């Protein structure tokens, strides 16, 4: 449980930031996937509201970044907002982007990283320039490389902060219930998937009407990527919690954004009615759980790494298994080394 049991699905991120202002004040935050009218903007706005001194906002489009920075600066003129280009579809571009952050002397340390970018990419299977299934590449592997590369600046923050005050927050989803991580066929190349990695077809059939089938499914791809987000947090804590850098994953809720409007528009009325978490939260409400995960000192990895509606909650055993988390971390390291020709250095 979070330290405030009254926080719930209706809680405002601005209220959370005000409640934990002592934790946000004068801190440096980096948030991926920030654009106008999205959850990332809501998270950035809340950190600024709580008194953060520097907020780095990343995205693929320079024009969109400049627009959101203009909006945020107008409302919070005392906060330094840094736009930073990040394209998670390319591992080389991701590495280059991370190195630019590391080389930026105006940002000596980073207290919080919020891995918010990504989404569900409906339609047929798509591959990135690295030959990876796009949902896995963007939602997990790109963030794995980017966040892990920022470890030196997270460590600098941790050295001058109380243990656990430096954190990595990963935006996951309750869609993790759709599928475990498919180690046997994470890229949807057609390999046989063992029973313990098979998807849960029941909610897919109930909501979307899809019968069980072989081959690619955008929803299964999304589900396994959200499971990967939690496993990333689990193994991050194994590696770095002793250094005072914690990681948590969370479900922001069904948030009404432009992106979810596009998904909603593709669904029939009957399908929308069956959604366990319809797109009814405001952006401010959707950002609230990320603020709790970042700022509540009562949270520790031992109490749980996944939050929903501002409270710690359980996930299926396959999503917080330390063995599976370690296995995914190793797979991710190997893929980065294979695609980039050099290993990720974390020592």
List PLM regions with ranges.
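Alpha-helical membrane-targeting segments
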Residues: 1-11, 256, 260-282
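Rossmann-fold NAD(P)H-dependent dehydrogenase/reductase core
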Residues: 7-256, 261, 346
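Alpha-helical packing segments of well-folded alpha/beta enzyme cores
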Residues: 68, 228, 232, 286-290, ...
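C-terminal helical subdomain
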Residues: 225, 273-312, 322-324
């Amino acid at each position: 449980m979070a330290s405030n049991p009254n926080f719930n699905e209706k809680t405002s991120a601005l209220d959370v930031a005000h409640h934990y202002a002592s934790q946000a004040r004068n801190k440096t935050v980096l948030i991926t996937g920030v654009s106008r009218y999205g959850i990332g903007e809501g998270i950035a706005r809340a950190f600024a509201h709580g008194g953060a001194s520097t907020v780095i906002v990343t995205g693929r489009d320079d024009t969109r970044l400049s627009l959101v920075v203009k909006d945020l600066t107008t409302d919070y003129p005392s906060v330094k907002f840094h736009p930073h280009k990040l394209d998670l579809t390319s591992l080389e571009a991701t590495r280059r982007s991370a190195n630019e952050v590391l080389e930026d002397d105006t940002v000596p340390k980073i207290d919080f990283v919020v891995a918010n970018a990504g989404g569900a990419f409906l339609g047929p299977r798509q591959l990135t320039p690295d030959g990876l299934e796009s949902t896995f590449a963007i939602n997990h592997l790109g963030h794995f490389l980017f966040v892990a590369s920022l470890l030196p600046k997270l460590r600098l923050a941790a050295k001058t902060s109380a243990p656990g005050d430096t954190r990595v927050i990963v935006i996951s989803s309750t869609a993790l219930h759709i599928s475990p991580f498919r180690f046997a066929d994470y890229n949807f190349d057609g390999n046989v998937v063992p029973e313990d990695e098979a998807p849960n077809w029941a909610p897919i059939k109930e909501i979307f009407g899809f019968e069980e089938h072989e081959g690619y499914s955008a929803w299964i791809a999304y589900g396994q990527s959200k499971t990967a987000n939690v496993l990333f947090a689990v193994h991050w804590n194994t590696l770095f919690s002793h250094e005072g850098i914690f990681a948590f994953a969370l479900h922001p809720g069904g948030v009404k954004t432009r992106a979810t409007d596009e998904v909603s528009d593709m669904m029939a009325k009957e399908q929308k009615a069956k959604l366990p978490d319809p797109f009814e939260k405001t952006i401010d409400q959707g950002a609230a759980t990320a603020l709790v995960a970042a700022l509540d000192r009562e949270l520790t990895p031992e109490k749980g790494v996944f939050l929903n509606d501002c409270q710690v909650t359980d996930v299926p055993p396959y999503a917080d298994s330390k063995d599976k988390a370690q296995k995914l971390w190793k797979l991710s390291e190997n893929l980065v080394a294979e695609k980039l020709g050099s290993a990720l250095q974390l020592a």
